[in-house]
């Protein structure tokens, strides 16, 4: 008996931060703030789409760093251990999932896109992710506006 299909959005955190101009600008002076802005955006996206969000930040060049996993609302934030890239974590994670799961990986790294496609996931570029986020926000606003209008009419 197979389990229920799950929908995932896996985000290569620093790759997306460096691809989005507004986050890249913030990261120059405050990397933590840029991470939080990305986390907030993915929380909102995951709430709207129902996807399980996973953001992976690598600690590849940080000495003596242990893997840290943090849960926030409907997403998981992963800080990889020393010498582990976000790419290797993402590849291993995808390999652990069921073939029935729907997995999207957000990265601009072409080599990583090819690897995740080979593992059965789909890829989404930083630009496509940004457009999806903007569309989700627009639909949330529309939904809230129509709900507000219904309340006013009653």
Identify the role of each PLM range.
Residues 2-11, 15-154:
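Nuclease catalytic cores that cleave nucleic-acid phosphodiester bonds
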